[in-house]
C-alpha cells in the first residue's frame, strides 16, 4: 500500500509550523499506524533529514501517549482504539492522510506532533489521593460494593488521559477527563471521604489551566478511544454542585 502523508512540522513551541508532504510506499495492511511513521522516519534519517517527532510509549492502548489528529479525527477513523492500535488497512491504498497534533490551548505544541499534556497531570494532582489505613491489611469483603457501582467505577477508570476529549471539543473542554477521574472514585466508598474536596479542586484547576466550558455536544464521547460516556459528566456536575452547596 502507498500513501501520501501531510504532516504538521514545527521546530518548537515558538516557531511557526506548516504541513509538509511525504510519500511512503510498500506499506503492509497489517502495519500499525505508528510503525508506518517509524518507516517514514527511517527513510528521512537515511536521507539526512529531520525525523518526525511524535509521542508513543506502550503501543498497546494503555498509556495514552499517542496523541494524533488523523484526517480530522482524534486517533484516526477507527472507533474505540488509540492511534497505536490502528492499522493501515483502515485507509484506502493511494489515499492522502493528514496528521497533526492535538489542537487545544491547554496542550501547547513542543515539536512537530508532540504536545505538552502536563495540564492533565496538574488536574490529577489537584484531585489528590484517597484516605487509607496504613498500619494493617484490610479484611476481605469488609467493604461490600454493589456490582453495578463497581462496573461504573471501572468504566470511568478506563480513561488513559490521552487528551482526545479536550482536543476534539470545540470549546477545548476537559470535562470528560475530569468527570472520569471523579466518577471512578465517587462510586466507591473509599472515594467518598474526600469526594467534595476532590470535585471542587479538579474543576477549579481545569478552569485555571485554560480549558473551555462543556456545552454537551458529545464530541468527546464519540472520539474517546475508551468509549467513556458523557453520563459521567452529569455525575461530576452533581458532585460539584453538592460540594458547593455545603460551603
What would you call each of these model-derived segments?
Residues 53-65:
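Short, structured protein-protein interaction patches enriched in aromatics and acidic/basic residues
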Residues 70-94, 99:
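Glycine-rich phosphate/adenylate-binding loop and adjacent beta-alpha elements
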Residues 31-50, 97-247:
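Ferredoxin-type iron-sulfur electron-transfer modules in oxidoreductases and energy-metabolism complexes
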Residues 8, 24-25, 70-72:
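Short strand-turn-strand beta-turns centered on an Asx-Gly dipeptide
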Residues 20-32:
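Short, contiguous acidic and Ser/Thr-rich linear segments
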Residues 62, 68-70, 220:
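Functionalized membrane-embedded alpha-helices
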Residues 1-22:
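Eukaryote-biased recognition of intrinsically disordered, low-complexity regulatory segments
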Amino acid at each position: 500500500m502507498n500513501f501520501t502523508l501531510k504532516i504538521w512540522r514545527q521546530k518548537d513551541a515558538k516557531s511557526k509550523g506548516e504541513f509538509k508532504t511525504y510519500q511512503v510506499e510498500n506499506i503492509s495492511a497489517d502495519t500499525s499506524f505508528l510503525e508506518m511513521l517509524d518507516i517514514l522516519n527511517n527513510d528521512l534519517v537515511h536521507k539526512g533529514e529531520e525525523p518526525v517527532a511524535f509521542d508513543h510509549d506502550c503501543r498497546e492502548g494503555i498509556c495514552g501517549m499517542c496523541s494524533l489528529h488523523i484526517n480530522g479525527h482524534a486517533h484516526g477513523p477507527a472507533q474505540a482504539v488509540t492511534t497505536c492500535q490502528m492499522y493501515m488497512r483502515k485507509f484506502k491504498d493511494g489515499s492522502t492522510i493528514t496528521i497533526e497534533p492535538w489542537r487545544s490551548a491547554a496542550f501547547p505544541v513542543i515539536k512537530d506532533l508532540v504536545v505538552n499534556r502536563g495540564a492533565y497531570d496538574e488536574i490529577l494532582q489537584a484531585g489528590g489521593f484517597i484516605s487509607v489505613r496504613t498500619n494493617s491489611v484490610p479484611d476481605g469483603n469488609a467493604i461490600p460494593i454493589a456490582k453495578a457501582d463497581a462496573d461504573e467505577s471501572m468504566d470511568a477508570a478506563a480513561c488513559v488521559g490521552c487528551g482526545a476529549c479536550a482536543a476534539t471539543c470545540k470549546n477545548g473542554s476537559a470535562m470528560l477527563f475530569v468527570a472520569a477521574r471523579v466518577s471512578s472514585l465517587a462510586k466507591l466508598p473509599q472515594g467518598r471521604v474526600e469526594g467534595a474536596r476532590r470535585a471542587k479542586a479538579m474543576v477549579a484547576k481545569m478552569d485555571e489551566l485554560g480549558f473551555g466550558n462543556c456545552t454537551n455536544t458529545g464530541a468527546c464521547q464519540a472520539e474517546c478511544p475508551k468509549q467513556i460516556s458523557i453520563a459521567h459528566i452529569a455525575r461530576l456536575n452533581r458532585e460539584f454542585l453538592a460540594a458547593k452547596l455545603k460551603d
